C-alpha cells in the first residue's frame, strides 16, 4: 500500500510540474506573441510615417520647382518687355552690325529692324501709360480743333491692327479700359500724340533740308579771305615806319644826343630843274627806305637833294659852319669867299639864311667841302670834335659828288632866286 501511495505521489507531482511548465510556457508564448504584434505595428507605423513624410517632401519640392519655373517665365517676359523699351531709347552695341552704319532696334513684338528715330519715338509713345492716362500736351484749343476734324470710326481698322500687333497697347488697353478711361478717350489721346509726333518730325525734316540747302549754297569763305588778304592795304604799323637814314658815325659810336647836333637845312624850294647827269657827273644820294603809302615822307628826297646842293655850294665858297656841342646853334650868316682860281670874277651874293629843322630823331650833321681843284667832295663832321679824315674814305665810298663849276653856279643862282621859305611852310612839309 505504501508503494502505491509513492507512485501516486510521483504521478501527481509530475502532473503538477507539467501543468506548471505548460502554464508558464503558454504565458511566455503569449508575451512573445504580444511583443511581436506590437513590434510589427510600430514598424508598420514608422514605415508609413516615413513614407508619408518623404512623399510630402517630394510633393513640396516638385511644387516649388513648378512655381519657380512660372516665376522665371514671368521674369523673363518682363525683362524682355523692359529690354524692348531700353533698346528703343538706346540700342545696345550687340544689336549693331559693323557693316556701314546699320543699327538694329527691337520692336514691341520681339523682332528686330533697322533703327529709325521716328519709329523709336512711336514705340516709346505706345508703351507709355501716360499717353493714355494724362491730358494731351499743349494748349487745349489745339486738341479741340484737332478733335473736331478727327473721326474715330475711320480708325477702326488701324485700331484692330494695333491691338493685334502691339502687345504693349493691348495690355494697356485691357488694363485701363473702362476702369480708368473710356474707349474713345484712350484712342483720342493716342492718335493726338501720334499727330504731334508727326508734326515734330515734319519740323525736323524741314530744318534738316534747310540746313543742307544753306550748306550747298554757302560760298567759299576761305577763298574770299585769301583774295582779301592778297589785296589788303598796308597795316598802320607798316605805314608809320620812319625813314631810315644811313648814320655817318662808325659802328660802335653813339649818335648825337645834344640839340645842337640837328640838321641845318637852308630854306629853298626843291630844285626840280637840276637833274643829275647819267654820266660820271652824278650824285649818289643817301639810301632811304620810304613807304609809298605815306605822302609826306615822299618829299624827303628833294629836300635832301637841295640840302646837299646848298651845302656843297657853301663849302665851295670856303664856308665854315661851327656848331657847339651844347645849346642850339643860332642861324648862321656866312660871308662869301672867292674860290681859288676865280679871283677876278664877280663876288657872288650872300647865301640864304640857314635854319634849324626839328625832326623826330636827331641825325648827323655833315657839310660837304667841295674841292675846286679835284672836283671831288670830302665830308667833314662839324658836330664832333676833331676832323673827319678818319671816316672820309667811308663817305667817299657812299657819296660820290661830281659837279662842274658851271653846275654849281647854276644851282647858286636858282637858290638865290627862289627866296626864303617861312617856318610855317616847313611845318607843312613835315
UniProtKB/Swiss-Prot annotation:
UniProt biased composition (Polar residues): 276-291, 371-390
Annotated ranges, domain BSD: 146-198
Keywords recorded for this protein, A-Z: Phosphoprotein
PROSITE patterns: BSD
Name of one Pfam family that matches: BSD
Chain residue ranges for the region called Disordered: 247-298, 319-398
Domain of life from the UniProt record: Eukaryota
Residue positions where Phosphothreonine is found in the record: 356
Residues making up the signal peptide according to the UniProt record: none
Chain intervals with Basic and acidic residues compositional bias: 350-367
Residues modified as Phosphoserine: 92, 166, 387-388, 418
Coiled coil: none
UniProt xrefs under InterPro entries: BSD_dom, BSD_dom_sf, BSD_domain-containing
SUPFAM superfamilies assigned: BSD domain-like
Any Gene Ontology CC annotation: cytoplasm
Protein name: BSD domain-containing protein 1
